[in-house]
């Protein structure tokens, strides 16, 4: 399975005109919420989520090591911007490039920093099903709200293997389980069968075939929650009425943009929401236009999360960061040092 998040952000991203909409959401404001299914497990899940970057130190003796102090700063920023929750150590969070011990540290630090102000989903997928189950139990012990996983990666490329993989992980804890669908075409008659498994109650859908998704949803035998995972397609997904929110990479950089998309879609004000979706598309377009943009862009808002780990990323130079800064300046809607101003 190809889990390259960039492939799923890039398709459909287009440069659009500047709309001049700087987003500063106030989490204390009474806002409209996208609907969620009935049931306690779905309470408080509606809205925009960041697939959180896993922060590392940049430079010095700790270069590339997990930066837990930055995790606390990220959490505070996301709370202030009105995000609903965080999705940890998935594709954006470089889960497969972290050790199990590092992933557990991320879960624990996020939960203790959030203090119940953000919902937390831990992606626990590993190459080995057994390792995934062990990590799921560690995540549950850390206090996360849900666990999640991609289908088998590299090995186990069959529906039967994926079913067994999900069965084992979802039964490893009593927490609700969120399928992470990315990289393969959704086959309604097959995919719906995942929802017959214990504790499987939702999906992060990083795809664009809303027809097949709808066909699958009509076959569900129990309530389930869905999140749009392709940043540049969030509003398209919300317009189908199938999604309760979004989980994405660039929600880290411009969280208020996605908060506004969800709020306005909940009010059925899609014309206003489209202006914020244009911000998303322009930011995603910059991500693919400038070398080293991914993750290093967080320096612009004052939250340096370090370089992506090899082989996913090669450390950037000061000159390359200057190009990233120039590209974000040109967008006109991202406030420099927003997290510390």
Enumerate the predicted regions with their spans.
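Catalytic alpha/beta core domains of metabolic enzymes, predominantly
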Residues: 183-279, 287
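Structural preference for beta-strand elements that scaffold enzyme active sites
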Residues: 47-49, 85, 119-121, 146, ...
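Active-site beta->alpha loop and helix N-cap motifs at the rims of alpha/beta catalytic domains
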Residues: 42, 56-182
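Structural motif
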Residues: 11, 81, 142, 172, ...
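C-terminal segment of N-terminal export signals and the immediately downstream linker at the start
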Residues: 23-51, 61
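N-terminal secretory signal peptides and thylakoid transit peptides that target proteins
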Residues: 1-16
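Conserved short secondary-structure transition element at the edge of the structured enzyme core
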Residues: 239, 279-312
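Conserved, mostly hydrophobic/aromatic
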Residues: 60, 78, 110, 169, ...
